Each structure stands twice: as structure tokens, then as C-alpha cells.
């Protein structure tokens, strides 16, 4: 029985090790380099604010919704419309596996987020942004981060 407990502890450490929670400034640099500053007319602070309220900058965040779909990754991108998981009848507009949205490499998540902003009503897709960031001063989000 003791070995089962030790095994469970090892597994939990390996799961935690795979999760990455970025700092605000590290994410600001990644987002700026990826061209998110002013993408779709939204300043960098909007992206940082949205990612904070959607996932607290956690790349492996997953939330199962009442309709059975799942929101994935740092931007909480939904499986029903934007990515492909094991469920059928998904639109997969980003042409990406949902698992690609929960890795430390943010490339697929950023490309998909750009597509969402371009093909929907801007950042209104994200409830976290609407409730906490819309029509607010976004300059504080990048303050002290050495990004222009």
C-alpha cells in the first residue's frame, strides 16, 4: 500500500511539472513577439488581462462546460468550435488538436486566439475580458515589463 502512495505522489509531481504558469511580464514579451500588441485593434494589455482572467496564465487550464465542451489553455479556447478533441461534431475552425492548446509552446494557442478575434466580435468571445478588461485602462498590465 505504501508503494501505491509513493507512486501517486510521483505522478502528481510529474503532472505539476508539465504545467506552466507564466508571469505577466514573461507573457507580455511572448505576446509582443507574436504580434498580439494592437492585433485586431487590441493593445497588449487587453491580451494580458484576458489571459489572466481566463486562466491565470496557466497553459494547462481546462474547464468542462455544462454543454459537454471543454475550454483549453491560457486563452480557454472552446473545443466545440475552435479545436479538435475526442468528441465528434466539432467545427475545429483553428484546425488544431485541443491538446496543442495546453502546452508550454503558445504558438497554436496564439494563432487560434488571433483567428477568434478576426472571425468573431473581437475579444467579446472571452467572458473574462468582457467582465474585467473591456473599457478599462490596460496600460497597467504591461507596466514594468520592458515591452514597448
From Swiss-Prot:
<feature type="disulfide bond">
    <location>
        <begin position="25"/>
        <end position="145"/>
    </location>
</feature>
<keyword id="KW-0325">Glycoprotein</keyword>
<dbReference type="InterPro" id="IPR019799">
    <property type="entry name" value="Glyco_hydro_22_CS"/>
</dbReference>
<feature type="disulfide bond">
    <location>
        <begin position="83"/>
        <end position="98"/>
    </location>
</feature>
<feature type="active site">
    <location>
        <position position="71"/>
    </location>
</feature>
<comment type="similarity">
    <text>Belongs to the glycosyl hydrolase 22 family.</text>
</comment>
<dbReference type="InterPro" id="IPR023346">
    <property type="entry name" value="Lysozyme-like_dom_sf"/>
</dbReference>
<dbReference type="GO" id="GO:0005576">
    <property type="term" value="C:extracellular region"/>
</dbReference>
<feature type="domain" description="C-type lysozyme">
    <location>
        <begin position="20"/>
        <end position="148"/>
    </location>
</feature>
<feature type="disulfide bond">
    <location>
        <begin position="94"/>
        <end position="112"/>
    </location>
</feature>
<feature type="active site">
    <location>
        <position position="54"/>
    </location>
</feature>
<dbReference type="GO" id="GO:0003796">
    <property type="term" value="F:lysozyme activity"/>
</dbReference>
<dbReference type="Pfam" id="PF00062">
    <property type="entry name" value="Lys"/>
</dbReference>
<keyword id="KW-0326">Glycosidase</keyword>
<keyword id="KW-0732">Signal</keyword>
<feature type="glycosylation site" description="N-linked (GlcNAc...) asparagine">
    <location>
        <position position="58"/>
    </location>
</feature>
<keyword id="KW-0964">Secreted</keyword>
<feature type="signal peptide">
    <location>
        <begin position="1"/>
        <end position="19"/>
    </location>
</feature>
<keyword id="KW-1015">Disulfide bond</keyword>
<dbReference type="InterPro" id="IPR000974">
    <property type="entry name" value="Glyco_hydro_22_lys"/>
</dbReference>
<protein>
    <recommendedName>
        <fullName>Lysozyme-like protein 1</fullName>
        <ecNumber>3.2.1.17</ecNumber>
    </recommendedName>
</protein>
<dbReference type="InterPro" id="IPR001916">
    <property type="entry name" value="Glyco_hydro_22"/>
</dbReference>
<feature type="disulfide bond">
    <location>
        <begin position="49"/>
        <end position="133"/>
    </location>
</feature>
<keyword id="KW-0378">Hydrolase</keyword>
<comment type="subunit">
    <text>Monomer.</text>
</comment>
